[in-house]
């Protein structure tokens, strides 16, 4: 089955899910039973009715990102063929693969550095270096393609940047940086694994050279799955990459909704110009702050073909902590005076749809207990939003799990399992919102990343 056929089947399934959900939820009115005949003003009272309508309209905050996901998943081939090199890897500019770590998992770092180096060599890439930037020495073996940078404890940036921002800024200092302005940096987390497909995509991106920033797809169900619940929940993020992220970069070439912190490709001159020295507020979600600053300075972005591999958090607590940090960090970005309002408008709408999630999800209960009549368009849009969000989990599994590897029965079980994780994920996201709003904002929680640590405990 070729990629075009797969994409058409995916689009058919998506439309089927939308139409089915619209009909059964009342988004599309097919008979008189689809209409709500209650007069809420007399039935529930004025205050209760106003609150019910406010809760219903809060759902619409997610509409911009839902539309981006829908368009990205439909208008671009969701199952592209293997990436084909558009030029010789020998002609590619110098590439530095930069891994930032605290140094808590040295064995993991050593293993992944070796794997990633071999992946680059297998792809034919010759002009590259792997840099590991760490707070604590991991004692990497000496190799001409590997450089270990230990950030001194006494190092401070001009604005007092912390955590990952501080480490990344240290690498850009004149007495540390060994790269030319025309070189490129591929930013990875310590658990991120390159694939030959992603290396070819990066080579094509840097050979093209039209955009100084780029990012691609990360999947989470590769090799051994540690926690099935968090992995299935993260299938949503896979769809988010293939939908919203891909559309904003391929069509607009702007990080309208920000980007991720790994699989980040930057040109050195642009990265140094934007800088990671963005104070405390820019240190919790440093990737988001960096993208918004680059956006406000007029830099352009593009989507990079080819996927990389990561693992989902190993425990539900880590999953919760991860989401809490993202929420807190993005809120700091949205509220920062350093980012012009027009550049963070869509990001602000997106994060406030997340902040109000405990209120908007209460519609599930209140809509059943206290139905209210709404304009047909509102009912249609609300059902459309719900259908797309459900399908995001389904598509994420289809994209992440191999039918040949798992077999039809286990593959369908994974799809069903992803749908079943939605209530759990909603609960976790709601807890993360509440905890994020009342908890300490300037904290950087690092999740467990080394499987071998779990195996020996």
Swiss-Prot record:
Q: Name the InterPro entries for this protein.
A: B_mannosylTrfase_Bre-3/Egh (IPR027389), Glyco_trans_2-like (IPR001173), Nucleotide-diphossugar_trans (IPR029044)
Q: Which Pfam family is an annotated match for this chain, by its short name? A: Glyco_trans_2_3
Gene Ontology annotations for the cellular component aspect, listed alphabetically: cytoplasm; membrane
Q: Which UniProt keywords apply?
A: Developmental protein, Glycosyltransferase, Membrane, Transferase, Transmembrane, Transmembrane helix
Keyword Phosphoprotein set for record: no
Q: Spell out the subcellular localization from the entry.
A: Membrane
* Predominant location category: membrane
Which Gene Ontology molecular function entries are recorded, alphabetically? beta-1,4-mannosyltransferase activity
| GO biological process: one example | oocyte microtubule cytoskeleton organization
* Its EC number(s): 2.4.1.-
Q: How does the entry describe its membrane topology?
A: Multi-pass membrane protein
Where does the chain cross the membrane?
A: 8-28, 35-55, 57-77, 346-366, 378-398, 415-435
Q: Does the keyword Transport apply?
A: no
- Looking at the record's lineage, which domain of life comes first? Eukaryota
Name the PANTHER family on file. Answer: BETA-1,4-MANNOSYLTRANSFERASE EGH (PTHR16779:SF1)
Q: Which family does it belong to?
A: Belongs to the glycosyltransferase 2 family.
Main function: Glycosyltransferase with a proposed role in glycosphingolipid biosynthesis. Neurogenic protein implicated in epithelial development. Critical component of a differential oocyte-follicle cell adhesive system.
Q: What is this protein called?
A: Beta-1,4-mannosyltransferase egh
What is the protein's species of origin? Answer: Drosophila melanogaster
> Which gene name does the record give?
egh
